[in-house]
């Protein structure tokens, strides 16, 4: 009627009859009533039905089934920590964390990396290449991930939330640093005096107290500072900029801290 070859119809009918017969056997064996099936029980029975059908297939058919998408495939386990990977190459890369092996070396500075992709990204420091550009403001980046984080400045997206105080962050590393406020963890310790810090950047700035290094110089008077923030703050002395305004009396200040001190005394005067 539909124009299919007779042999095809017979073959299809034969397979259908076999499946119906097998389904009936399974129904009896597992005491399954399709009319009473709901949700997971129906799914579990169908899964069992497919599994037992698979066991009846030839080894060749089962091998093809196991290689098909959606079917559990071979996993590669790390002998050191037990972590599993779907690809052998991913396991090899992971194992270098345990062995410390870094076979990819930068020819310009000698720094080594576990993965070739990391070396390629690093080399952009030397070449100045920044292939990832923000469509919003035109700023360019050497890494795709850095661009993704930057774009959240424009969108306001902060997908990483602290489970303790619900404060949100643009990237995962900032969230990790923030969590140390709650845990009290300070993993970065000064070798000179033993003082510990929650952020690596804070340790770097602190070390300058011991070394005397002041890499940020004022363009007006050449006075130098340990941090860029202090240098920018000092620059307001020359420009006369006073961006911090008291909402009660209108007086303005160059530093936020100075405004805070003033507001305490200002509010006391107004209440008298």
From Swiss-Prot:
Q: Which residues bind Zn(2+) 5?
A: 246, 249, 262, 266
> Which residue numbers delimit the CCHC-type Zn fingers?
244-266
Binding-site residues for Zn(2+) 4, renumbered to this chain: 197, 200, 213, 217
Give the subcellular location. Nucleus
- Keyword terms, alphabetized: Metal-binding, Nucleus, Repeat, Zinc, Zinc-finger
- Tell me the residue numbers annotated for binding Zn(2+) 1: 78, 81, 94, 98
Entries under Pfam families matching the protein = zf-C2H2 (PF00096), zf-C2H2_6 (PF13912), zf-H2C2_2 (PF13465)
- Could you say which residues bind Zn(2+) 3 here? 140, 143, 156, 160
Domain of life where this protein originates: Eukaryota
Zn finger limits (C2H2-type)? 76-98, 104-126, 132-154, 160-182, 188-210, 216-238
The entry's function note states: May be involved in transcriptional regulation.
Q: What is this protein called?
A: Zinc finger protein 32
